Swiss-Prot record:
The lineage of its organism: Bacteria, Pseudomonadati, Pseudomonadota, Gammaproteobacteria, Enterobacterales. Induction: By stress conditions e.g. heat shock. The gene is dnaK. Keywords: ATP-binding, Chaperone, Nucleotide-binding, Phosphoprotein, Stress response. Residues 532-561, 603-637 are annotated as: Disordered. This is Chaperone protein DnaK. Residues 603-615 have a biased composition (Low complexity). The keyword Chaperone applies. Acts as a chaperone. Belongs to the heat shock protein 70 family. InterPro entries: ATPase_NBD, Chaperone_DnaK, Heat_shock_70_CS, HSP70_C_sf, HSP70_peptide-bd_sf, Hsp_70_fam.
Length: 637
């Protein structure tokens, strides 16, 4: 069996590591560097360049030099972030036929996974050059807050690169593996703060040691998949452009060549300001007008940079609070804070994190290499090279189905350890219902329509039976990569239908973040909606059972007893169509009051011989959740 390599496929830089003699080793690429820029260039003569060679020629070929592609994976073209990136990226972002964000390279539309595959090929070749043998298997890392679509796209990129992706693992979890593997004994709870080139994650992880076996259990995760070093660079670029326009009256935004030079200079200045208090951005011959060539020379202080990006750093603090709350912990419960990602080298970031946790982050973890090292460790675990290590990761958002009244019924809640499988029995909402539509949704809201529709499928061939009698078992199964499989089975006939949620119907990060924000902001309206639906269901049940008793009574019940019941039923059915909970409750009560004669009649009939059947029916009813499945048009698929 060959080596399973570990790859950190980053927004700005990528890194590859292997297990060598029981230790993780980060490999140097052909240029002699331990990290490779995640930059791909397509030259005029048809050559594809990856890494440093692509970065070096970017100034002369800005429109065909692609970077930060990870920010586009799993995104729709119309996403707010994509539209914002279009304005600042020198290359062309276009809409695909399915609405995804793709790229235009020399007139050809290319999907982000195809471009990311070029970086993965470079990582694969680096490992093969070191090992002297073919490499076909890898563990690849993704941000913890990546959704199903983004995880699928990463696996696709691996497949395009000729790799069998044995496992997708979360970046903070990988960093925890790198940190915790060689540490001493004892149980610890750590916070991994991962601010990379394009994404931000926070994970709270518990490391337990029992009889020599280490368990890495993720307690909670949170993040922002559109926050990273690229955003910090953009603030610096915009500042330099504004200063130059103030000085020279020329807007450099319209000059791709100048913008590419500015991007390089801004990134370099940002890095220098992590160790220096001031730096000069000096770009001679940046542009020209009728009066001759123009030179850019601007002094930037660390204080100025900090004022430009302060809100970005602050944006990373809220997810820390949510993650701690979800884990049921306080700041004092955290033993160690680990910083991952190149952007965490910025002193302001380190200071904010230290201020929040009340302790200095550890300095013995390499922020650029820790994730790749952890991926290699996981590869070693899968290959049997590394013993006594167990990794327990989580799913970032709740998953469920739409049930009666448009409610989302969760089968798997957020921060559940994966892989996981959960089943629940539902039933029909109508008598003799022969088919149901299973509508799968993801998110934290109570109303199914407020969450993301992941997909739907039909289960038909259900045998005729009164409502609430058929037993339909719905099973959600999330694999170790965080990818969802759903099945529905009619327990009576044994008929089953399955679906794997495809990448095209995954969530994009804006939707994830919006769901979490909405769930917090709308907790009260969600509670009221849930109460209204429960009352509606009670009213529906009362109307259904009363109508059934009326029909069974037939002419045996006098007309003067029937008339008020019929009137009360009509009023209740009208109220059920409205949104007034108190009105529905009043009409249920009114129906109960006028139905006393009917109930007495039903009890007499039951005493006459129907008691056994009714008891059996009630028992079956108790074992099922009343649910309604109705076809929902999924316009976002």
């Amino acid at each position: 069996m060959g080596k399973i390599i570990g790859i950190d496929l980053g927004t700005t830089n990528s890194c590859v590591a292997i297990m060598d003699g029981g230790k993780a080793r980060v490999l140097e690429n052909a240029e002699g560097d331990r990290t490779t820029p995640s930059i791909i260039a397509y030259t005029q003569d048809g050559e594809t360049l990856v890494g440093q060679p692509a970065k070096r020629q970017a100034v002369t070929n800005p429109q065909n030099t692609l970077f930060a592609i990870k920010r586009l994976i799993g995104r729709r073209f119309q996403d707010e972030e994509v539209q914002r990136d279009i304005k600042i990226m020198p290359f062309k972002i276009v809409g695909a036929d399915n609405g995804d964000a793709w790229l235009d390279v020399k007139g050809q539309r290319v999907a982000p996974p195809q471009i990311s595959a070029e970086v993965l090929k470079k990582m694969k070749k680096t490992a093969e050059d070191y090992l002297g043998e073919a490499v076909t298997e890898a563990v690849i890392t993704v941000p913890a807050y990546f959704n199903d679509a983004q995880r699928q796209a990463t696996k696709d990129a691996g497949r395009i690169a000729g790799l069998d992706v044995k496992r997708i693992i979360n970046e903070p979890t990988a960093a925890a593996l790198a940190y915790g593997l060689d540490k001493g004994q004892g149980n610890r709870t750590i916070a991994v703060y991962d601010l990379g080139g394009g994404t931000f994650d926070i994970s709270i992880i518990e490391i337990d040691e029992v009889d020599g076996e280490k368990t890495f259990e993720v307690l909670a995760t949170n993040g922002d998949t559109h926050l990273g070093g690229e955003d910090f660079d953009s603030r610096m670029i915009n500042y330099l452009v504004a200063e130059f326009k103030k000085d020279q009256g020329i807007d450099l935004h319209n000059d791709p060549l100048a913008m590419q030079r500015l991007k390089e200079a801004a990134e370099k200045a940002k890095i220098e300001l992590s160790s220096a208090q001031q730096t000069d951005v000096n770009l001679p011959y940046i542009t020209a007008d009728a009066t001759g060539p123009k030179h850019l020379n601007i002094k930037v202080t660390r204080a100025k940079l900090e004022s430009l990006v302060e809100d970005l750093v602050t944006r990373s603090i809220d997810p820390l609070k949510v993650a701690l709350q979800d884990a049921g912990l306080s700041v004092s419960d955290i033993n160690d804070v680990i910083l991952v990602g190149g952007q965490t080298r910025m002193p302001m970031v380190q200071a904010k994190v230290a201020e929040f946790f009340g302790k200095e982050p550890r300095k013995d973890v390499n922020p650029d290499e820790a994730v790749a090292v952890g991926a290699a460790v996981q590869g070693g675990v899968l290959a049997g090279e590394v013993k006594d290590v167990l990794l327990l990761d989580v799913t970032p958002l709740s998953l469920g189905i739409e049930t009666m009244g448009g409610v989302m019924t969760s089968l798997i809640t957020k921060n559940t350890t994966i892989p996981t499988k959960h089943s629940q029995v539902f039933s029909t909402a109508e008598d003799n219902q022969s088919a149901v539509t299973i509508h799968v949704v993801q998110g934290e809201r109570k109303r199914a329509a407020d969450n993301k529709s992941l997909g739907q499928f039909n289960l038909d061939g259900i045998q005729n039976a009164p409502r609430g009698m058929p037993q339909i078992e719905v099973t959600f199964d999330i694999d170790a990569d965080g990818i969802l499989h759903v099945s529905a089975k009619d327990k009576n006939s044994g008929k089953e239908q399955k679906i794997t949620i495809k990448a095209s119907s995954g969530l994009n990060d804006e939707e994830i973040e919006k769901m979490v924000r909405d769930a917090e902001a709308n907790a009260e309206s969600d509670r009221k909606f849930e109460e209204l639906v429960q009352t509606r269901n009670q009213g529906d049940q009362a109307a259904h059972s009363t109508r059934k008793q009326l029909d069974e009574a037939g002419d045996k019940l006098p007309a003067e007893d029937k008339a008020p019941i019929e009137a009360a039923l009509t009023e209740l059915n009208t109220a059920l169509k409205g949104e007034d909970k108190a009105e529905i409750e009043a009409k249920i009560q009114a129906l109960m009051e006028v139905s006393t004669k009917l109930m007495e009649f039903a009890q007499q009939q039951q005493a006459a011989g129907g008691a056994a059947d009714a008891a059996e029916g009630a028992k079956k009813d108790d074992d099922v959740v009343d649910a309604e499945f109705e076809e929902v048009k999924d316009s976002k698929k």
